[in-house]
Amino acid sequence: MGKQEDAELVIIPFPFSGHILATIELAKRLISQDNPRIHTITILYWGLPFIPQADTIAFLRSLVKNEPRIRLVTLPEVQDPPPMELFVEFAESYILEYVKKMVPIIREALSTLLSSRDESGSVRVAGLVLDFFCVPMIDVGNEFNLPSYIFLTCSAGFLGMMKYLPERHREIKSEFNRSFNEELNLIPGYVNSVPTKVLPSGLFMKETYEPWVELAERFPEAKGILVNSYTALEPNGFKYFDRCPDNYPTIYPIGPILCSNDRPNLDSSERDRIITWLDDQPESSVVFLCFGSLKNLSATQINEIAQALEIVDCKFIWSFRTNPKEYASPYEALPHGFMDRVMDQGIVCGWAPQVEILAHKAVGGFVSHCGWNSILESLGFGVPIATWPMYAEQQLNAFTMVKELGLALEMRLDYVSEDGDIVKADEIAGTVRSLMDGVDVPKSKVKEIAEAGKEAVDGGSSFLAVKRFIGDLIDGVSISK
């Protein structure tokens, strides 16, 4: 290869908001850090039928409009998507089937891109970076003799689980059993044995367990795995993979990658209302409650949270989703007279500018669903967390934060709303009090890990991991030429 700056990287994200926003930030990080070694990053964006595409694409384009070296290419939709009923019943099965249907579209897009690069002769595609849900697309990389790297928008602990699943499956060829909830699993990278009850709910049903295993079995085929975490946060997990005896890909701890922009469908007037209210509150006086973008709270659970907030009597911002078929707005789901009683105490909203809220000096605690992006954002701003996981790998994240790292306060570790599980008002109120008191999880400890994250990115371990990844990528292009 004649010039170092002639390398192009192709990134293929998964279109859930947390995944695609982290991907955009990853691309910016690679461009800002590598100087001229990467000429261009091309993001091949594809959508899902139930995600409004026009608004999403416009928002994503706005995020990269000042980044001339980042190109966003939108791909056509799958013509015969899996039935929506499959997503409702077995989300992981739907996701894997949809990704497989995207493979021919990705192949055509990549073929077109490679042909244009061959004609110009000035830029060479160095490799692919795939969201971990997109690992079936490793086959496309192999067809074009391109190395595939995985971008894991989760923790090193989650990576340990993905290594563990195929190993367990070779011995026990069936899904996990909820009746063995207290069974302990020796997951790589964990100091503590991990109880079955905190594993992703999809591992307990055959229809969704098999896609998890199929994805995990493809991980060793990658050239390397970029993990959105850092060594100071998960030292044991990364130490394990550093000395991993198996033929496993190189691990690059490149986090924290923080999503600096909130989701596209936030009303700007609502954002202004929330931030203006926060500006008037004392430092560290507000608890922020937010439960993610995919789960609706039941009416019973909403009532219990409302009672708890009245009991605890501290300032709050409470963001939650409701079923639009049942309620036109979150206010309709609240107990009668609740807003009148807490008029001076807090704000209720359906959507909130999470990054801005967590960054605000008035916020002193976060009751979180424990999505990994949310955990990194909260830690990044030094805000203590109380764990209330809802779905996917969030129970495992909560276990990691509470039991493994001692960086969060336990509300619940194994909450499963589908089982009719309800957290009572007294329990919620007690946890919120403890969170805001800062005794069980001192704010100083969270601040220390926040500083460690900043240092990792600013010339420290994560900076060096990105540098090593770029070097490996460019060297691979030079060798293959």
UniProtKB/Swiss-Prot annotation:
The keyword Ribosomal protein does not apply. Pfam families: UDPGT. The active site is at residues 19, 131. Transmembrane segments: none annotated. Keywords: Glycosyltransferase, Transferase. An anthocyanidin binds at residues 19, 392. Its EC number is 2.4.1.91, 2.4.1.237. PANTHER family: GLYCOSYLTRANSFERASE (PTHR48048:SF45). This is Flavonol 3-O-glucosyltransferase UGT71C1. It comes from Arabidopsis thaliana (Mouse-ear cress).
